[in-house]
Amino acid sequence: MNTCRVWAPNAREVELDLGESRTVMTRAARGWWSADAPLGDFDYAFRIDGGQPLPDPRSMWQAEGVFGKSRQVDHSRFQWTDQTWQAPPLASCVIYELHVGTFTPRGTFDGVIENLDYLRDLGISFVELMPVNEFAGSRGWGYDGVALYAPHHAYGGPAGLKRLVNACHERGLGVILDVVYNHTGPEGCFLPQFGPYFTERYRTPWGPAVNFDDRGSDEVRQFVIQNALMWLRDYHIDGLRLDGVHAIFDQSAVHILEELAGAVRRLEAELGRHLFLIAESDLNDPRLVRPPEAGGYGLDAMWSDDFHHALHTVLTGERDGYYEDFGRLADLAKAYTDGFVYDGRYSAYRGRRHGRP
């Protein structure tokens, strides 16, 4: 038998719904529930306190979309051929970012595979996939995902993503995956019905913040960390680009980004291949990429928005919004050499100093 587990700390009763049968789950410590389940692939849902069937927060496959049942996946069944693959160092790489749904007319992982030779011949080093986890519907940028463990069914699901990563590695191309840990989408998100995945302590542009330091946050932190490790371990992804870390709020003694980086370093040692984390941040804070022993979080790289903004304003002359702070060739030169234009300088757009040396 297999064991299904789910975290629902506020529930009085949780049932495992297999369609033809329901099983009342057994409560364990810290709000976890468990029940025996069949071996192999099967569809299932959870019912909390007699309510409607809900997909598993850690569902590995939503074959019928975010409102359907979850499906178990045996990751060991896929036949990988990339056992000797090692990603090249980031510092010498060219990254090509693409959106699976619009990169080809097919809008699938297999559609991307058909164009990998073209990408390789361009001279790129990495394919960076915009978020591929399940969101409501079949069209979207991916940044409103709600089933964080499940590759989108319209793109080809778990098997399709594995085929794409394997095909990239066969052609000498690494794979970076965008992941979003600062919010979820507004439609089809059932996480609040299971537990305190969000907190009202902070607000983001998209609503309540993910709960990294409020009551119940230990399990939420593990939910995120295990998600990141799953992409790297089970899908052979080489690195993750962390969306908008300036909207990840955490006043814990060990910040979630530092804890995540430590977990990735341990997985890297276990697997024997290089893994990395890239931050997107508008804070201009070099502590993101400093090692923990130097007071940093230990990430491997971060996007330089200042370089983009400086180049954009030089080429276009646009000065609206945050582009107000840029527009000189000297800004572009400083962004190129130092990483940041605003490293503690006064920002007219913000009306205060911005960044850190």
Model regions and ranges:
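Conserved alpha/beta catalytic core and glycan-binding cleft of carbohydrate-active enzymes
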Residues: 257, 261-357
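The feature marks proteins involved in alpha-glucan
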Residues: 1-3, 24-97, 102-107, 118
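Substrate-binding/active-site clefts of carbohydrate-active enzymes
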Residues: 83-90, 99-239, 244-270, 288
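Short glycine/serine/threonine-enriched helix-capping/active-site loop
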Residues: 96, 177, 279-280
